[in-house]
A protein has these predicted regions:
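Catalytic phosphate/metal-binding cores of nucleic-acid and nucleotide-processing enzymes, i.e., regions
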Residues: 1-71
Length: 71
């Protein structure tokens, strides 16, 4: 699935929690989280603030599980 398909799936609510985390990890890594509409940057910031993602886009799966996201 290419990035556009992933974004459409996210917008349509078709991604589960893990899919959303993986999408935002990719958006942080490639910098798109900060150039798309504001929601994406805010969500990426929340995931970073909670420790689920690092500022480099790495995923802390144990932290995600603590927040109820099945990885």
């Amino acid at each position: 699935m290419d990035m556009i398909d992933k974004l459409i799936a996210y917008e349509e609510g078709m991604l589960d929690g893990a899919g959303m985390v993986y999408l935002f990890a990719e958006l942080v890594r490639n910098g798109m989280a900060w150039s798309l509409q504001g929601h994406y940057g805010r969500m990426a910031s929340r995931l970073i603030d909670t420790g689920i993602l690092t500022k480099d886009g790495d995923i802390d799966e144990m932290r995600a599980i603590e927040y109820g996201i099945e990885m």
